[in-house]
Each structure stands twice: as structure tokens, then as C-alpha cells.
């Protein structure tokens, strides 16, 4: 979908859970509460088990469909729960970036831990850690594994291959809290 198409869909869905489909990348859809659509990215709160679990910045061109509760009865029920559980008060993302370049510049400054998804022709790779530098179109990351061990070498990520960045989620935030940086 284009940025304009996405803006049109989310325009009247203020603070509602929507189902976002990335047909080329994922068989599974995501439940998200969109915050804004920028030039290249959709920024949204991530919904998991009736709770907000961080934020996602998704490259718009990979979004193939956005489904609202008008087309999906289950989403209507989820939005009812979302409202009754008072989840609408979850703070907006502090990053208001419409491109991955701008987002990564902010992440270098903040030192926040993130999960970066890169979409290659034959595979999808995930890198979890902190963005430590941005030079041209290459971001440098200090990554860690599921055992909390830092990678010996830093990882270089080409922004052209980044399809999504997740931050503020419980897994990444909790792991990063206990890593010996």
C-alpha cells in the first residue's frame, strides 16, 4: 500500500485496533493501533494478549492490507475489550519519525534497545540490540542473543533492507535491562 492509501484507511480509525497484513513477508497478520503514517513508515502501538506491547515502525510498501473492525467482527470485540480495559491511555511513541533514517538517528542518540527486521529475497533476519552508529545508509548495532550474550562483533544493517523496527516491547526491553553492556 502507498502512504496515502494507508492514511486514508487509518484516518477514521482513531485509537482503534486494526489488523495489518504484510502479505509478502508474513503469513501472520499483526494487531496494531496506528499512531501516524509518515512518508515511508507506519508507526503503531503493538497489541498482544489484550495489552500494548511496545511500538512498531513498518515500511509502508510491505503492507498489503489493513482491516478494520467494520470488516472483522473479532476486531470489533477486541476494540470493546481495549476500551473497557482502559488501554487507550498507553503513551504514544516518543519517536515521531517518518523514515528509517530519521528513526535510526534518534535511536543512536537514545540508546534504546530495538529489534530490527530485515527482509532479503530468500530470508528474513532479526537483530536485537542497540543502534550505536549511523553512517550513510548503514547502521551499526551491538546485538545480543536469547541468552543475554553480546555478539563479539557489531552488526552492520543496510537501511534499504529494514522492513520493521520494534521497540519498547517487553521482551527486548527486559533483556536489554539485564545485559552487561
Can you name each region flagged by the protein language model?
Residues 1-28, 47-124, 145-181:
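Short glycine-rich, low-complexity segments
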Residues 27-36, 126-133:
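Short beta-strand-centered aromatic/proline hotspots
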Residues 33-51:
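N-terminal beta-strand/beta-hairpin edge segment
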Residues 37-42, 68-72, 134-139, 167-170:
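Short, conserved beta-turn/loop elements at beta-strand boundaries and strand-helix junctions
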Amino acid at each position: 500500500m502507498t502512504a496515502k492509501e494507508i492514511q486514508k484507511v487509518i484516518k477514521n480509525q482513531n485509537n482503534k485496533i486494526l489488523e495489518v497484513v504484510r502479505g509478502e513477508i508474513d503469513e501472520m497478520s499483526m494487531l496494531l493501533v496506528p499512531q501516524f503514517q509518515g512518508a515511508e513508515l507506519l508507526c503503531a502501538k503493538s497489541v498482544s494478549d489484550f495489552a500494548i506491547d511496545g511500538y512498531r515502525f513498518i515500511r509502508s510498501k510491505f503492507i498489503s492490507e489493513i482491516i478494520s473492525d467494520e470488516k472483522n467482527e473479532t476486531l470489533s470485540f477486541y476494540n470493546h475489550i481495549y476500551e473497557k480495559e482502559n488501554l487507550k491511555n498507553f503513551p504514544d511513541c516518543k519517536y515521531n519519525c517518518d523514515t528509517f533514517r530519521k528513526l535510526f538517528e534518534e535511536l543512536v542518540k537514545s540508546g534504546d534497545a530495538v529489534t530490527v527486521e530485515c527482509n532479503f529475497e530468500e530470508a528474513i533476519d532479526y537483530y536485537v540490540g542497540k543502534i550505536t552508529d549511523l553512517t550513510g545508509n548503514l547502521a551499526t548495532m551491538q546485538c545480543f542473543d536469547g541468552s543475554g550474550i553480546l555478539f563479539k562483533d557489531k552488526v552492520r544493517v543496510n537501511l534499504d533492507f529494514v522492513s520493521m523496527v520494534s521497540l519498547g516491547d517487553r521482551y527486548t526491553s527486559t533483556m536489554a535491562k539485564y545485559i552487561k553492556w
